[in-house]
Amino acid sequence: MPKTFFITTAIDYTNSPPHIGHAYEKVLADVIARYRRLKGDKVFFLTGVDQHGQKVQQSAAKAGVPPAEFVKEITQKFVDLWEKLDVKYDEWAETTSERHKKVVQGILQRLFDAGQIYKDKQTGYYSVRQEQFLTDKERGPDGQFGPEWGQVEFREEENYYFKLSQHKEWLLQYLDNRKDAVIPDFRQTELRNAVEKLGGDLCISRPKSRLDWGIELPFDKDFVNYVWFDALTNYISFAGYDPSQSTLSSQPSTFRDKWPALQIIGKDILVPAHGIYWLIMLHAIGFPDDQMPQLLVHGWWNLGGAKMSKSAGNIVDPFVIVDKYGAEPVRLYLTGAIATGEDADFSEERLLRYYNTWLANGLGNLVSRTLSMVHRYLGGRLSRIQSKQSTKLASSWLNSIEQGVLTGETFSYSEDFDETPYDKVFSLPKFQVHKAVGLIIETIAKCDRAIEESAPWQLAKDPTNAEELARILYNLTEVIRVIAIWISPVMPKTAHGIFDQLNWKMELSEKEERFSLADAEWGRLPDGHVVGKPKPLFPRIETDKGV
């Protein structure tokens, strides 16, 4: 039985409402999850919120409300945004849940009993942002701590520590042996360089006298767990992990069926959180090398070349953007206008151009124009006419359409979907979602050029061209159907809207609302199929109204 495709995102910290960067990560994960469902895979998509920690306690105090009440309100904002953006997760993680607390405490007790956790006093410089003590290894060439550490202050405190440094050589060897542990590969190089500099152990507690909003240590009631063993553990606690079982083979089948996961994170939490702390934590509790998660690291959406931040006042509110342009155009822009793993500048002007160029004038116009011609010249009924020229199928109709010749052969492709360009760009190991979006956009543009070159309106003037006209309009309608399936992971409601206008229901899907890549096989629109009437999919937005 095939394993479940398990995909996670970072859980979002509930000290402030979501911004466009949160939206990008979740939409990216949702698109990949939908693509795997499209291929017929069973998928488990986990996301959620991190509700504990010093910043939450401070923000709640500033707001004059208890932490539990504060995080409940912020949590709801994230839930509302994912609903608004049509992000369909299978499990929701909240770190205040009892289920999660039991797993965290179980893991901590196991590590404490194994001598992996010890108590010690520490004096030194402390990063308020990263909530950790720093060493000289974190200093830059100028001897100062870099801006990534935020406010740094001198502290003395007794706490519990995890023997992180003991596992340094293991992590280096693991990264050397597995070349795709981190995607893209330059991030793996970045991680390995950071591991080389790894020195001390990891503080995993805070005294309750300073922080009481957290999970109590099972072996010392005067301390709460520090953020890492709380936040990072969600990836397994909400997937069914049992901390009482010391080996992976003895875990419940519900967990073994899912693990390992593809974990989508931002570049700012690769080092040290996920690339060092998380991988070493898993190794310490018995996860073998071949069961380590794969880390897909995305870049940032900047604004005017600068990182978005509340303090700089340059945050893009995703609620406002979605209300203005719609969820599906925003999903298309967020996944199409940034290369996976790289940074990009968020621009509302560019989003508007995306909408008008590729949706209003592109896909929407292609559907409307084609179906209007089918009704005008064929009475709304398609005729599937085989080409007289050749019966040999092209391996990729995308390469042939460049010529602007719309024949049955041009729009056919290999029966092996692993050989189609669409499937390649979505599949392991790169997850190049932006290239899949680009392929769809390119196909729409080629269809428009092909219509102009074949000029169905001219063919319709001569009855002797009836077969050629019918063949062209069938192929155009069929490629629109294929595009709808291709675009469904990014724009599911748009895909359904196109199917409604085509008057077509998916044949191979288990449920009507579930798309199947097998349905993209060429020629599924039968001879004599009657299409629906065209309706505007994306009304054009005038520039002065959009921005």
Task: Label every model-predicted segment.
Residues 94, 264-268, 469-470:
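Active-site rim elements
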Residues 125-130, 297-300, 349-350, 384-391, ...:
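A glycine-rich phosphate-binding loop feature that marks nucleotide/adenosyl-phosphate handling sites
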Residues 255-264, 426-431, 456-459:
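Helix-loop segments that flank and shape redox-cofactor active sites
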Residues 319, 423, 484-485:
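Amphipathic alpha-helical segments within well-ordered protein domains
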Residues 2-40, 44-47, 99-103, 147-376, ...:
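Structured secondary-structure scaffolds
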Residues 159, 345-359, 400-408, 413, ...:
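Extended, non-catalytic structural segments that build the interaction scaffolds
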Residues 1-4, 18, 44, 48, ...:
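Basic, alpha-helical terminal appendages of large translation-related enzymes
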Residues 1-14, 31-204, 241, 245-254, ...:
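Conserved, charged catalytic cores of large soluble enzymes
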